Amino acid sequence: MTNFEPKKLKNIWTIEDSISTYNIDKWGDKYFSINSKGNISVTKDIKSENKIDLFKLVKELKSREINPPLIIRFNDILKDRINALHDSFFKAIKTYKYKNIYQGVFPVKCNQQKNVLEKIIEFGSQWNFGLEVGSKSELLIGLALLENQNSLLICNGYKDKKYIEIATLARKLGKNPIIVIEQRDEVKRIIQAVQELNATPLIGIRAKLSSKSSGRWGKSIGDNSKFGLSIPEIMLTIKELKEANLINEMKLLHFHIGSQISDIAVIKDALQEASQIYVELCKLGAPMQYIDVGGGLGIDFDGTKTSSNTSTNYSLQNYANDVIATIKDSCELNNIKHPIIISESGRAIISHCSVLIFNVLGTSHVSSKLQIFDKKNQQLIISNLLETFYELKKLKNKKINLSQIIELWNDAKKFKEDCLVAFRLGFLSLAERAYAEELTWACAKEISKNLNNDAINHPDLSEITETLASTYYANLSIFKSIPDSWAINQIFPIVPIHRHLEEPFCKGNFADLTCDSDGKLNNFIDDGKIKSLLNLHKPEEDKDYLIGIFMTGAYQEALGNLHNLFGSTNVVHIDINQDNSYKVKNIIKEDSKSEILQLLDYSSASLVESIRINTESAIDQKKLTIEEARKLMDQIEISLRKSSYLSE
């Protein structure tokens, strides 16, 4: 096997090294970088030089008692994403001489927070940007927030009689709801509502496409997809709308090919099929005006620009070009007027603006020191393990033969296994077993210190890195703040927000606060590759080590749950000023323990009273003094008002 030079440490760690290690310049989309102080910086928009220091911001928020874990939302980035989406479509419309407009909507399910939706409507108002809703509750939000009478309100999801009645009558308020038929029985309900209410809604149809999708949400398309009408069902629906004299209200064709589509070829295939369906609907006599291409516009979480589940092999402009060009070609071939194009791009709009910040509470790692052990009474199997360790130490600063290293490591593993067998049979003491494990770790450390990355990643040695990895204990709940990481193994960019002038020598992963073995983060973006460990710094005593999880704006807050009763974190909305300062626009305080318990039907007052009765009983039995009881009750009442997360 190949001989390797001994591992050499880098003399100076630079900002460029950190940018490369964490791939920030690739996934950051120019919104995130590292400043001269070694801290993460946040840019106002991709064309701006206005930046703020994220680490400084978090420290100053702490001085206001807004502590991690917290979500920081940058309004300027949200605005820039909306601008970028519209700019891309406007450029495509101009390039391809498309004879109509783009008019987008934001899917409320991506982030239902009131402050978020208000900002989206504000930033998109110049383009009549609307909302897409998928339930009666979301419909009520849309009707309340959308005041622009030119904005669209796309009504998707399952629809009962009340849903259809509300959407139908809302048209008389000057709103623009379009009821999208996704199930056959909705046709009958719409006809019934028209007859009973003396009002007519705008109508759309969602088509089930036969085009094949890809990625995690590939089953959103095809004959067995959850929503939409098959082609025979569409034909029957058109017939029934004509018979009910409602065909003139049929305005929109909608399709959806899934979320986070990574391959542009999938989008092109779906567009070609849907465009032809649109053309045929026009030929059947429906006065069509809109084609809603749904969601699916992906973002590049890992920065690789590939067709992997966590990336995309296309840009925002590529996407807009293909949408415009494909629809135009189909319409012009059939002498059909170009429709208004709608998209429901949620993730691409909302993801970048949110950063989840948490602090590290502590770490655990393999022992760095060997115990002093009595060699006279040492068992042979332990002596063999110790001899292997000494053989590895002799290789320090020498040219290393990889086959020799692999042989010694295999010996160490075998001797350790022999020790475990001996312990189970009662031939080794607990202290001897501990010494054997420490010797094995010491062997792994000697190999790690001497081999470069290429060698240590050899299949026969790769487990060494895992063996030596540290666990960093994170002050957050994965199930509450980033549930997609647990549920679907979604990978988010995770980066320390400071100390980037120092080399991150440690390899580690994160464990959250919950009592659940799934509460771990162990998939990371490392130099453009997905790895199980992240380069991290050793936390400094009495100093915060702050980590950022980026691109978390879509779905996470809506999907988060109360596992172990960890509640919502602090949320702060920030505006970046022209002078590189910032303004705190909104603060949404975290859930207190009392508020969380109330959600589950517990009365804080009743709980306190129940515990107080127990303390009185303990006082009577001389188990507790009055002073101890008072202190306990004070702590409980204070705790109920405080965060569910750990504090200093």
From Swiss-Prot:
User: What does the record give as its pathway?
Assistant: Amine and polyamine biosynthesis; agmatine biosynthesis; agmatine from L-arginine: step 1/1
Q: Is S-adenosyl-L-methionine found in the keyword set?
A: no
| Disulphide bonds in the chain | none
Keyword annotations for this protein?
A: Decarboxylase, Lyase, Magnesium, Metal-binding, Polyamine biosynthesis, Pyridoxal phosphate, Spermidine biosynthesis
Which Pfam families does its entry note? Arg_decarb_HB (PF17810), Arg_decarbox_C (PF17944), Orn_Arg_deC_N (PF02784)
Where N6-(pyridoxal phosphate)lysine occurs along the chain?
Answer: 109
Q: Which reaction does it catalyse?
A: L-arginine + H(+) = agmatine + CO2
Does the record bear Zinc-finger in its keywords? no
Family matches, as InterPro entries: Ala_racemase/Decarboxylase_C, Arg_decarb_HB, Arg_decarbox_C, Arg_decrbxlase, De-COase2_CS, De-COase2_N, De-COase2_pyr-phos_BS, Orn/DAP/Arg_de-COase
User: Which BP terms from GO are recorded?
Assistant: arginine catabolic process; spermidine biosynthetic process
Recall the GO molecular function terms of this protein's record. Answer: arginine decarboxylase activity; metal ion binding
> Which cofactors does it use?
Mg(2+); pyridoxal 5'-phosphate
The UniProt entry, under SUPFAM superfamilies, shows: Alanine racemase C-terminal domain-like (SSF50621), PLP-binding barrel (SSF51419)
Q: Which residues bind substrate?
A: 291-301
Q: What is its EC number?
A: 4.1.1.19
- PANTHER family documented for this protein: ARGININE DECARBOXYLASE, BIOSYNTHETIC ARGININE DECARBOXYLASE
Functionally, this protein is described as follows: Catalyzes the biosynthesis of agmatine from arginine.
Q: Which family does it belong to?
A: Belongs to the Orn/Lys/Arg decarboxylase class-II family. SpeA subfamily.
Q: What is this protein called?
A: Biosynthetic arginine decarboxylase
Native species of this protein? Prochlorococcus marinus (strain MIT 9312)
